[in-house]
Amino acid sequence: MSNNFKDDFEKNRQSIDTNSHQDHTEDVEKDQSELEHQDTIENTEQQFPPRNAQRRKRRRDLATNHNKQVHNESQTSEDNVQNEAGTIDDRQVESSHSTESQEPSHQDSTPQHEEEYYNKNAFAMDKSHPEPIEDNDKHETIKDAENNTEHSTVSDKSIAEQSQQPKPYFATGANQANTSKDKHDDVTVKQDKDESKDHHSGKKGAAIGAGTAGVAGAAGAMGVSKAKKHSNDAQNKSNSDKSNNSTEDKASQDKSKDHHNGKKGAAIGAGTAGLAGGAASKSASAASKPHASNNASQNHDEHDNHDRDKERKKGGMAKVLLPLIAAVLIIGALAIFGGMALNNHNNGTKENKIANTNKNNADESKDKDTSKDASKDKSKSTDSDKSKEDQDKATKDESDNDQNNANQANNQAQNNQNQQQANQNQQQQQQRQGGGQRHTVNGQENLYRIAIQYYGSGSPENVEKIRRANGLSGNNIRNGQQIVIP
């Protein structure tokens, strides 16, 4: 049994919980009473084996299971006390020792019930104190899960806030073009307004100067004329750019209005000044001149546009008529050349027919000549082939005759040799028959046994005599064969 305390002093300092100790002792007594009751029931029903064998088996089981049961009970008690108050009760240790002292009284119980009791306590121990490593792992996984959830919620909130914020205006190709165009229009309008304001203020200053000083009337008139000239140039520029930009047209109209207002102010200033009467009249005449020049320029432009339209119409008619005339001329030329070609074709067909007939006749005569030549060549080739075949046959017959003659000579020589051999064999047989005996081979006789039978010994000389007398080359003889014995 493992002890988690450093020394006895600290062990004695731990608190004692009487309630848990009483509950534990009651559970142990209840389990022991149930086991005794079950043991008595089974002992009455079962048939016992021999006494010594059962006693030995019971001792072995008690020795193995006793320590396990004590260890499990102590572990369960320690875990319960640590979970409730974090301390250990000394009485639980005493109860564990008391259970150890009470164990021998249960030696009559069968090993089966002891194993059941051990399994129950083991299951309770597994439930009561899980492994600390698993608890730590679970705790760490729970913390990781909480951190992950917090991080995910923060990221989701940031994404939602970004989605709710207004998106930036990205300058794509089309947007850049539109923005640049709008900026350009705004700049032109501002410039026109500034010019009109400057122009208007200049006119007012000229009129005031003309009204206050008679001597400065001429200078005011000159300033007014310069301003008018500048306004005329701006107005002509606006008229030329009227088709390109509507905003510039509006700006030019504002300029003209300011210009008229300036003229009115100049006339009033000229009327108030007595000495500047001539200068005022000049300024009025100069003010009327831009309108006349503007109207004249507009009329001139309209006249030029009208003339251009007429020229365009004339040019369009000429452009339409010129291709038609060219097409008519081309068609006429093609018709003329076509008629000439047809006439030439008709004349050429007649000449071609005559030439074709002459050519056909010449081809026929050539074909006849070639056919004759071919027939002659064929006859010559056939004659030459026949002569060659005859020569080949003659040579072949000669070679066959020579071979036959040679074969006949060889056959005659062979026949003569065979005849001589036969004569020799006959002579030998006659000699043997005249001076020896005959023996018929029976059973498994051989030349060695035959020599022993007739000569008394089977020496190689006697065997060789029999061979020579019968014309044998080896020792092979057969049943029923007649052998001459010399």
Curated annotation (Swiss-Prot):
<feature type="compositionally biased region" description="Basic and acidic residues">
    <location>
        <begin position="126"/>
        <end position="149"/>
    </location>
</feature>
<feature type="topological domain" description="Extracellular">
    <location>
        <begin position="2"/>
        <end position="204"/>
    </location>
</feature>
<keyword id="KW-1133">Transmembrane helix</keyword>
<feature type="compositionally biased region" description="Low complexity">
    <location>
        <begin position="204"/>
        <end position="225"/>
    </location>
</feature>
<feature type="compositionally biased region" description="Basic and acidic residues">
    <location>
        <begin position="1"/>
        <end position="40"/>
    </location>
</feature>
<feature type="transmembrane region" description="Helical">
    <location>
        <begin position="320"/>
        <end position="340"/>
    </location>
</feature>
<comment type="function">
    <text>Promotes binding of soluble elastin peptides and tropoelastin to S.aureus cells although it is not able to promote bacterial adherence to immobilized elastin and, therefore, is not a microbial surface component recognizing adhesive matrix molecule (MSCRAMM).</text>
</comment>
<feature type="compositionally biased region" description="Basic and acidic residues">
    <location>
        <begin position="247"/>
        <end position="259"/>
    </location>
</feature>
<keyword id="KW-1003">Cell membrane</keyword>
<feature type="compositionally biased region" description="Low complexity">
    <location>
        <begin position="403"/>
        <end position="431"/>
    </location>
</feature>
<feature type="topological domain" description="Cytoplasmic">
    <location>
        <begin position="226"/>
        <end position="319"/>
    </location>
</feature>
<dbReference type="Pfam" id="PF01476">
    <property type="entry name" value="LysM"/>
</dbReference>
<feature type="transmembrane region" description="Helical">
    <location>
        <begin position="205"/>
        <end position="225"/>
    </location>
</feature>
<feature type="compositionally biased region" description="Low complexity">
    <location>
        <begin position="278"/>
        <end position="297"/>
    </location>
</feature>
<feature type="topological domain" description="Extracellular">
    <location>
        <begin position="341"/>
        <end position="486"/>
    </location>
</feature>
<feature type="region of interest" description="Elastin-binding">
    <location>
        <begin position="14"/>
        <end position="34"/>
    </location>
</feature>
<feature type="compositionally biased region" description="Basic and acidic residues">
    <location>
        <begin position="103"/>
        <end position="118"/>
    </location>
</feature>
<feature type="compositionally biased region" description="Basic and acidic residues">
    <location>
        <begin position="361"/>
        <end position="398"/>
    </location>
</feature>
<dbReference type="GO" id="GO:0005886">
    <property type="term" value="C:plasma membrane"/>
</dbReference>
<dbReference type="GO" id="GO:0045121">
    <property type="term" value="C:membrane raft"/>
</dbReference>
<feature type="compositionally biased region" description="Low complexity">
    <location>
        <begin position="233"/>
        <end position="246"/>
    </location>
</feature>
<keyword id="KW-0472">Membrane</keyword>
<feature type="compositionally biased region" description="Basic and acidic residues">
    <location>
        <begin position="180"/>
        <end position="199"/>
    </location>
</feature>
<feature type="compositionally biased region" description="Polar residues">
    <location>
        <begin position="64"/>
        <end position="85"/>
    </location>
</feature>
<dbReference type="InterPro" id="IPR018392">
    <property type="entry name" value="LysM_dom"/>
</dbReference>
<feature type="domain" description="LysM">
    <location>
        <begin position="437"/>
        <end position="485"/>
    </location>
</feature>
<feature type="compositionally biased region" description="Polar residues">
    <location>
        <begin position="150"/>
        <end position="166"/>
    </location>
</feature>
<feature type="compositionally biased region" description="Basic and acidic residues">
    <location>
        <begin position="299"/>
        <end position="314"/>
    </location>
</feature>
<dbReference type="InterPro" id="IPR036779">
    <property type="entry name" value="LysM_dom_sf"/>
</dbReference>
<feature type="region of interest" description="Disordered">
    <location>
        <begin position="1"/>
        <end position="314"/>
    </location>
</feature>
<protein>
    <recommendedName>
        <fullName>Elastin-binding protein EbpS</fullName>
    </recommendedName>
</protein>
<keyword id="KW-0812">Transmembrane</keyword>
<feature type="region of interest" description="Disordered">
    <location>
        <begin position="351"/>
        <end position="440"/>
    </location>
</feature>
